[in-house]
Amino acid sequence: MQKFGGVVIPMQQSLDKEELKKITYLIGTADGICAMQKLPVKEPFDKKTEGFLNEVSKILMADKRVKIYSDVMTFAFWIRKANIEQLKRRFKRKDNDICLGKGLAFHIAPSNVPVNFAFSLVVGLLTGNSNIVRVPSKEFGQVKIIVEAMQKALLKPEYREINSYIALIRYERDRQINNVLSKMSDIRVIWGGDSTIEELRHSAIPPRCTEITFADRYSLAVIDADVYLGIKEKDRVAENFYNDTYFSDQNACTSPRVIIWTGKKKEEAKQVFWEKLYTLVEQKYVFQPIKAINKLTSAC
């Protein structure tokens, strides 16, 4: 916010609001975003926040659509009351000092991992902050289901105050919008790798703003052939590998790009592993034309 001699210049506020009107709001409003800077911070693991997340979990688990999205089911399980209490015990400070949130957190979620935005939001809420989260611009089914569950939970009278602490937004790449949201922030969380970080760094943040970035990184898997052949849950291993790799079309940083085999019976283990994975891929994986184009572009 620009000031001159201690007086706020309203022209800049007006320009900022015009930029905010370009945004599509899934939860929240332009006025709500402007008001976030004045919201009081909360203590970590605020009871109302915990209750809200548990309510979202219940709604998701009762939604039949969730059965086809293992990542949404994982999220619903993660935010249930029992797990939040476990996280709370891990977070508890031994010195008994009072902890408070820092303020307004601006999250830029990755475009290729549908549910990441929700995990980032939950961490922001549980640490006592108000949150503006840019969700993927692509219309993922998982995003729709989670947003609808949150909207439903926020309609309950006991959780309406949480509404002020959440803005889920969608907009195409726009540096002016990034500028407005960044200069409001007390925390900026950038997912999406090196190129996203480089672009967001063109948008200045306040001197006291904390920035958390997730740069490019790659994963590999190491499989002990002898141990693998000795376990009964080979179908479960194939399912987990599929979820980590094919579910995000190998775009997530946790998706293995290399598999290293160890042990004496490597060839036998490879044959069993790949056959089970092939059966699963044939049943579940849809190779869309846009995926082929993206892979070809990356290869070139």
Which role fits each region the language model picked out?
Residues 1-103:
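N-terminal Rossmann-like NAD(P)+-binding subdomain of aldehyde/semialdehyde dehydrogenases
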Residues 56-64, 154, 158, 204, ...:
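Structural signal for hydrophobic packing residues in well-ordered secondary-structure cores
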Residues 88-153:
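Conserved small-residue-rich beta-alpha loop and adjacent elements
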Residues 111, 137, 226, 263-264:
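Residue-level signal for short, function-critical loop segments
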Residues 112-113, 195-197, 267:
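Glycine-rich nucleotide phosphate-binding loop and flanking beta-alpha elements
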Residues 141-148, 155, 160-164, 171:
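Glycine- and small hydrophobic-enriched segments that form the cores of compact globular domains
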Residues 159-258, 263:
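Conserved NAD(P)+-binding/catalytic subdomain of aldehyde/semialdehyde dehydrogenases
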Residues 249-255, 260-300:
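NAD(P)-dependent aldehyde/semialdehyde dehydrogenase
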